[in-house]
Amino acid sequence: MHILTPTQAPLVPNPPHELMYTSSPLQISLPDFRRLCIFKGIYPPREPRNKKKVSKGSTAATTFYYTKDIQYLLHEPLLAKFREHKAVAKKIGRALGRGESGDASRLEKNLMPKVKLDHIIKERYPTFVDALRDLDDALSMLFLFANLPSSDHIPAKTIALCQRLTREFEHYVITSHSLRKSFLSIKGIYYQATIQGQDILWLVPYRFVQRTGGDIDFRIMGTFVEFYTTLLGFVNYRLYTSIGLVYPPKFNARSDEQGGELAAFQLEGKATATNGASNGHAEDAEINPEAQAIADRIGAMPDVEEEEATTAVAKTGAEDDEEEANEEIDKFEPTAPDADILPQPQASSAEVASLFAPFTFYLSRETPRGSLEFILKAFGCKRVGWDGVLGDGAFTTNESDPAITHQIVDRPALSNGAPASNVQETENGGAAAPKAQWPYSMMPGRTYVQPQWVWDSINQGKLLRADHYSPGADLPPHLSPWVKPKKGEYDPNLPLAAQQPEGEAEAFEDEGDEETAFDVDGDEDMEAIVDREGSVEVGEGMDVADDSEDDSDDDESDEEDGPAGDEDDLDSDAESDISEGEAARLQHQRELEAEATGKKLEVKKPTRKEENATIRKKAEKKKRAEEEERERQKMMLSNKKRKLLKRIEYGENKRDNESENLRRKRARVEKAKAAAEAV
């Protein structure tokens, strides 16, 4: 494999002054070459095996490219644009050198070539599905730049373009109800949408004050942003036209200046402008392309055929309603505890899309308004209100509005969350609506939840219990919806008893009792031992032995106890069997004595500790038998497979130990919580 650099010379991060690129077959500079490679999707391959031979003995940092990639770039039309740009830059430089700033600005305005990437988008993505598959990185990059502050490296024009494109994409997701899952992580908020059968996952950073460091190459990132903005513009146009909407949507600059964000865009259908009922926007009204096509056909038909067409449409709608009514989701339940768990069928997209449709939400000032508004509207909610200081576009800014059913808060209540009682009289003498101001008062009949309730509800596809997410409550764990727990791993969603192996609960209980007894009685027992009558402390009438004598005694005791300890370990199974047999024999003997004397046998009820010990012994015996059987099976394997199995068992044992530690920690926390509630 012959490998060639674009300049017939090694490419280094900081090329020396004497390295000339004019002899390059592409006739462009190194920054332009890297920019062109990003546009065309050409990336350096891995280092070749014969790196020393290809580098001709050079040890400098070198980037290699395939010869076919360089030949592929020779026919790129952008090369002419780069050369024109270089020529105009020289003219502008000469004008500035002569002090003719007016001529320089005129040259920059009139002669500077515009680089268009439309042909590259069509070349890299022959089909629309290909563009959707490559949309993850584009959305993550554009959402990142949309939340960055403007600076010398990032012009405000680029940030405004990223904000416009990303909000247009969010409007499509809201209108089509394509959002499926979301997750709050340390990096930001992950979103997953399903568009035309393709799962698209992107990351949106939290809205904090971003501080960019000096070690970031904004020139490379700006090149990616330039390409991704063109790509997302193509994708948005195709998505909008596929559902019968006009692209680009109308933009209200005044609303955007007032913090409207999504509210600054107004969607319109191709036939007539649509104004939604909530927040005055058209994202609430969906346009079905199939229904629009049928309506267009009906309008072109003669009057005689209109009745038949209308009847056909009504019949089709009735059949669809009947199919939706008969839809039932089958649940696959495991037949045995160790059986494979089949993936459960998901609820219909229509049900999930209207998850929050019946409710009216109000967002408190401390909650993330942008992400909550996007998620709530994407899942059917048409009425979202917030305080006026958060921006324009709210359904209502009155927190005391009686139409509000849910209020999302992110701080505990003050004054014990007392209901709103300051009822005032109106001018006509009637009672006015009470004024509710969280966290000082609560509105009767309104549900107060924390923001995590929204994320957990959409990830599970159903409305969860609101009392588990009440203000100030300990929230359940927020888990990633894309990571499914494997068999044997700890699952925080399941109850502890459902994932504990046999005998583990009893062992945890005994450990907890021993720790409690030691903590409570430890000091008292020690004082009783030290202060007992007749005790002699060190220095009171006795000699202290030398360290050497103590060491020798300890060594002798260790030598004497060593073999005995080994024998105890080896004969533990036999002792457990003997103890069980001895207990049965003693019980039988007591029964015979009671029968001979005519007395009633007193049945001694075992204590909780004895029951736990019995269950634990049975579990240990069963586990020991399984391990012995496994060892016998491993003896039949070859040495190679035995080593492979050993590595597998190492990973399984490590995972089991981690799961056991987590279960032990959870058992300790639940026990402490139960004790606190009992008190």
Curated annotation (Swiss-Prot):
The keyword Signal does not apply. Residues 573-679 form a coiled coil. It comes from the Eukaryota. One of its GO terms (biological process) is maturation of LSU-rRNA from tricistronic rRNA transcript (SSU-rRNA, 5.8S rRNA, LSU-rRNA). GO terms for cellular component: nucleoplasm; PeBoW complex; preribosome, large subunit precursor. Residues 418-427 have a biased composition (Polar residues). Residues 351-471 form the BRCT domain. Keywords: Coiled coil, Nucleus, Ribosome biogenesis, rRNA processing. GO terms for molecular function: ribonucleoprotein complex binding; RNA binding. Residues 413-437, 480-679 are annotated as: Disordered. InterPro entries: BRCT_dom, BRCT_dom_sf, PES. Residues 503-528, 543-580 have a biased composition (Acidic residues). Component of the NOP7 complex, which is required for maturation of the 25S and 5.8S ribosomal RNAs and formation of the 60S ribosome. PANTHER family: PESCADILLO - RELATED, PESCADILLO HOMOLOG. Belongs to the pescadillo family. This is Pescadillo homolog. It comes from Pyrenophora tritici-repentis (strain Pt-1C-BFP).
